[in-house]
Amino acid sequence: MELLKGNAVNLNDTAYYNNRELSWLAFNERVLQEAQDANNPLLERLKFISIFSSNLDEFFMVRVAGLKDQVSAGFNQPENKAGLTPKKQLNKIAIKAHALMTVQYDTFKNYVLPALELEGIERLTFNDLTKEQREFIEEYFDEQIFPVLTPVAIDAYRPFPMLLNKSLNLATLLYDEKQAEEENRTKLGIVQVPSLLERFIILPSEGQKHKFILLEDVISSFTHKLFTGYTVSSVTRFRITRNADLTIHEEGARDLLKVIEKELKKRKWGAAVRLEVGKEHIDERVLALLYEVLEVKDEDVYIMDGPLDLTCLFSLYKKLAPLYEHLVYPALIPQPPQDLGDEEDVFEKAIEHDILLHHPFESFQPVVDFVRDAADDPNVLAIKQTLYRVSGDSPIIQALKIAAEKGKQVTVLVELKARFDEENNVHWAKELEQAGCHVIYGVSHLKTHSKITLVVRRKNGKIERFVHLGTGNYNDATAKLYTDFGYITSRKDFGVDATNFFNYLSGYTTKPHFHHLSVAPFDIREQFMDLIDEEIRYHRQYGNGYIIAKMNSLTDKPLIKKMYEASQAGVKVELIVRGTCCLRPGIPNVSENIRVVSVVGRYLEHSRIYYFHHNGEEKIYLSSADLMTRNMEKRVEISFPILDIEMKARIKAILQLILADNVKTREQNKDGDYYYVINGSTEEIDSQVKLFKMAYQNTDAE
């Protein structure tokens, strides 16, 4: 009878869903909690403040900008989950974002800065400087800063300039006593703080102390040198965040590379979506003018009590970390993979058995070696790879270029539409083409987000295929910071699937046949819907239905509704969702059998793992895809099964360890709010630290 009652519930009820944007802000709040956590090393807390700022910048440039575009276009339809119109979403975002930024500045000013001072790291303002320090700073300004600055006067002939996205600016009110008429005596000048100059200027100080002054403090103090003949009456600091969402019209685009290069130039000058103003020295006349010229409303304006643009704290972290090792995380070195010895040949090992890699606990080097060794191997005929985000000096790109120069058939899909990596990827696409690689840009109207490499080798007259599949990017830099899985196999069916997949990307093929791969936008959603339905059937028959799903974000309504159906049927569902989660757990007759946790800690949880008990058969899939509508419909994604029994047991044990985390885990309640998990055991379990310890133990055991 309970099930009938559950089925009578309307699963479209907006009370059962979290709004996507507000859920994302709740995730960024968890990032901010890491800055507030006194158990974290002090400089790491500084870095989390910077990450929070960087995340929020992108959120305004893309998500808030998109909602503002909808409002401007007169679109007022409520979104399909929580039922909020674009206008309501913007109102709620403004309230939450103002509150979070206030907490951020309070954390920085009243907790982190005083703690840094106790360590001998101190921010000084111009008024705090000694005579010797003032002389040093004036000379530094004259020689290093002044030649780079461009003072811009605002008058009838020189209108308010178009200021760069995310640039820090000084609005200077000037007084001209020589003017006869009072109304002509006040002038306005704008000075952009150059982003290429060092933001933190280290001052001469005694002993081991590190005292610094901010670049904008120095420029503000010497503004009179830029506007000679005028009296400086005020200097107001402000920063603009602009709409940076690219509009790419792929229909009829003969050269996508050129279209994207053209659009990238516009990104710097989009409409203002946020105005940040420094509270100290604020001039109300300047503020009124900024409102007018930028066309912003009260909810778009953030008056902050401290330095603007705290993303800059990352550069301070990098400057101080080598000098204050006790204030950063202890070094943890990725270990040789469990399935691959230190010096073993990755291809020969893959012929023996499948290889599972768990980064950053296990080294990313075998993935680099996989491509590099293929480039050097005279028996290798072809290398095919998808690239979404790569590092600035990528060893994988270098290996692909070498392979092409050696005459191998090298095909690289470079995703030009990877947000905020477009410029980088345009650069790599050109370099790869010049080296002789066959570069493709993917499928029209879809982002290729899948992570796959195929190596084709002819040995002793036989063709062999080796495949690497991953949950994360081919990026050796982020592989040290993101948790991800990689999988290397020589199984014939996987090789055939990889060949068919690349032919689909490069040719006019419709959906190919796959033995093991599921590919979005074709069938990943359908596959997971079927798997959940099977779990419901098994639960009704045997009472042992159990699903674990780990991902970055969960927003897809059909899949959320299917999970609600599983909960109503009694299936136990445990979700590890780091970021946005539109599903609400613990609602009677809807989701009381669902638990949602989020782990935010030292490493960014990035792996996508989907586990189905399947009456003891235990099906496990790894994927490049989160359970988001965009991943199901607008991206080329791959989901693949783990077939090896030992590997499945290992992945399940990792999932259970993450679910047992009682240090970095927050749990979502039925109202959509997150709380730290109450530690019910005597042992503190930080899953990320524990996984590193296990990797070290495996190395020692060998």
From Swiss-Prot:
It is an enzyme of class 2 (transferase). Its cofactor is Mg(2+). ATP binds at residues 55, 482, 578, 606. It holds the Pfam family PP_kinase_C. GO terms for biological process: polyphosphate biosynthetic process. GO terms for cellular component: membrane; polyphosphate kinase complex. It catalyses: [phosphate](n) + ATP = [phosphate](n+1) + ADP. Its EC number is 2.7.4.1. Mg(2+) binds at residues 389, 419. InterPro entries: PP_kinase, PP_kinase_C_1, PP_kinase_middle, PP_kinase_middle_dom_sf, PPK_C_dom2, PPK_N_dom, PPK_N_dom_sf. One of its GO terms (molecular function) is polyphosphate kinase activity. The active site is at residue 449. Keywords: ATP-binding, Kinase, Magnesium, Metal-binding, Nucleotide-binding, Phosphoprotein, Transferase. It comes from the Bacteria. Gene3D superfamilies: Endonuclease Chain A, Polyphosphate kinase middle domain, Polyphosphate kinase N-terminal domain. An intermediate of this reaction is the autophosphorylated ppk in which a phosphate is covalently linked to a histidine residue through a N-P bond. Belongs to the polyphosphate kinase 1 (PPK1) family. Catalyzes the reversible transfer of the terminal phosphate of ATP to form a long-chain polyphosphate (polyP). This is Polyphosphate kinase. It comes from Bacillus cereus (strain ATCC 14579 / DSM 31 / CCUG 7414 / JCM 2152 / NBRC 15305 / NCIMB 9373 / NCTC 2599 / NRRL B-3711).
